[in-house]
Amino acid sequence: LVEVDDESWRILKEKKVPWPYPRGDIWARAVENLSKAGAKVIAFDIQFDSPDARSEYLRSVSNTLPAEFQQYLPGHGDVLLAESIRNAQNNGTKVVMDVKMVREPTRIPPTYIAYPVPEIMEVNPETGLINDMLDTDGFSRQYSIAGYMDHEPNTAYLTLGMKCVKSFLGMSDSIVPTFNEKERVWKFGDLRINAYGKTNNFLVNYYGPPSGYKIPGDNSYKPWGTFPRFSLSQILDTQDYDIPEDIDWMSQFIPGQVPDWVLQIKDSSEQKEMMSMLGIGSEFDIEKSPFYNKIVLLGVSVEVLHDVKSTPFYNYMDLSQLTPGMETHANAIQTILHGNYIDVFGYKTTRYIVDGS
């Protein structure tokens, strides 16, 4: 998980970077760094279906500037993000952008997919649906395999988690999910996904409480760490990008870069030993990167943005703990990759008998 968490929110605020973050300065750089660090799949739980606001403003005022100043304006954020996605894909990294299935009763047809802006779609990233699936009590337990539209009943629009799995396993675009009603199983290539009744959903087998949650009042406890998590500010922190509390953290996982704090070791033998331990410099080993051959989800966990869900671990250890929305995708992905499904006796009938819903 790469999160817009409290740390990155504070650090980028000190750097005068406004939310929503500029796509060229922030998200394009994140994609570039993660791809260089060996990520196999990069997925966004952030929508880019409208133009980059900062770039659009600069475009609107650029014509009023003298010609000699126009050359100093930064490139359009959507174009820069698209270029970083293209470069990542050329580097062997799959990039998955989130999309939404939207319904407008007065529109014909009423249902459509809200895709990222054309500049991004032109470089052909994968796309995956992020529409919420909530139970009657408001908890997130189910996850959709795909969405379908009435005017395209035979076209399966895979969800974000499913697209991540497809990209990670290198599955062909020709493979589509099919439902075995007798077994109540969805088949997707070699995968068998236990359906929740006769729906196109399955129950997520949550692996634990929210990864970044810490027991309040006791600093000796570390966050739960259900999934490895990193602050967005760490991913941006390289030699060519200065931030408050700058240590070039990400440089140790990028070929050809050595963090400043390593270069500042005065004893040459100690410096060489440290570089060897980190596997950087001439002995660089990409497999030591925590992102190597991994699915990396980018999203938000900072409380002010309110993208949180109630999950089965909401009252874990009698502590109310909301899970960032991006982490529900991570749990769904891990459930599929492990084949670790929850079997429901009686399917949905059991729930109807118990709660009368």
Regions found by a protein language model. Name each.
Residues 1-199, 203, 291-357:
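Non-transmembrane functional regions of envelope-associated proteins
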Residues 144, 165, 214-328:
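Acidic, S/T/G-rich, low-cysteine, solvent-exposed domains in lumenal/extracellular/periplasmic regions
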